[in-house]
Regions:
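Glycan-recognition and catalytic cores of secretory/periplasmic carbohydrate-active enzymes
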Residues: 22-269
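Active-site/pore-lining binding-face segments in mid-to-C-terminal subdomains
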Residues: 13
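Sec-dependent signal peptide recognition
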Residues: 1-10
Length: 269
């Protein structure tokens, strides 16, 4: 009886962690784990999604992150779109988290493995002791040259690269989602440390430099930093989120002026 009681308590605690994580950000929404799909087209589609996710190899998804952390990749990265600068790894982590929250044990196992590997990458970046690398969890190619010049206001490498912050945002979101949907505390810690990196890497830039930098596709950096503020109530995250708000776009829209013609929908919309 004691064993059964302890088991029930542990299960209840795990479920409450997931619920608390989601309610921390989305108080008007119910947790994914509260829904059980019955046989039908929605369950069929969900199961197909999971089956497709499980065809991928986590070590190949993680290869860009290990490489940029100075660690030997365990397997070669995927080619083509899946290997484009490492950003698909963040998408993959989000997908694992969402499906783990619906009860997929294999997705949960893979999610936890990826988080453990990303912890190794962050630790390796911290051991480098370089001014750009502390708390970095990115897989962007040539990260050392890119971010060491970027933090000084030199955007020559940044603008010559394929959408660095768009890329990194996917891993910010993946780590957040692993905590948000599954209550994974290690993912939460990694997410907040990565947000600390974003605060630090932009701290020396003027408002004018930030606005210029945001002319390059930058994903939802303002969103994830605002989420970090909602989680911790630490003002530094909200301040940084506001710096990532592209005023050239948002100011006219706040005044009901349409400024979207000829802009890139995936960036501005």
């Amino acid at each position: 009886m004691k064993i059964l009681t302890s088991f029930i308590t542990l299960v209840g605690l795990a479920m409450s962690l997931e619920t608390m994580a989601q309610e921390k950000l989305y108080q008007d929404e119910f947790p994914l784990g509260d829904i059980v799909l019955l046989d039908g087209p929605l369950k069929h589609a969900r199961d197909l999604n999971i089956a497709n996710l499980l065809k991928y190899d986590c070590d190949r998804m993680l290869a860009p992150y290990r490489k940029e952390a100075g660690l030997a990749p365990r397997k070669p990265t995927y080619p083509n779109w899946d290997g484009l600068d490492g950003h698909v790894g963040g998408h993959y982590l989000s997908a694992l988290a969402i499906n783990a929250a619906t009860g997929s044990e294999e997705c949960k196992k893979r999610m936890e493995y990826m988080i453990g590997e990303l912890q190794l990458c962050l630790d390796a970046n911290n051991r480098r002791g370089e001014d750009w690398s502390r708390n970095y969890v990115g897989g962007f190619p040539n990260s050392a040259k890119l971010w060491s010049t970027f933090r000084k206001g030199d955007f020559s490498v940044y603008f010559g690269s394929w959408a660095p912050f768009y890329n990194l945002h996917k891993m910010f979101a993946g780590l957040r989602d692993a905590w948000l949907y599954c209550g994974n505390e290690q993912a939460k810690t990694l997410f907040l440390k990565f947000c600390d990196w974003a605060v630090d890497i932009t701290s020396g830039l003027s408002d004018e430099q930030m606005e210029r930098m945001l002319g390059n596709e930058h994903g939802g950096m303002d969103e994830v930093l605002a989420d970090a503020f909602a989680i911790t109530l630490q003002q530094k995250y909200l301040n940084c989120a506001r710096r990532f708000a592209h005023k050239q776009l948002l100011t006219p829209m706040a005044q009901h002026h349409d400024c979207l013609d000829n802009l890139h929908a995936n960036t501005q919309i």
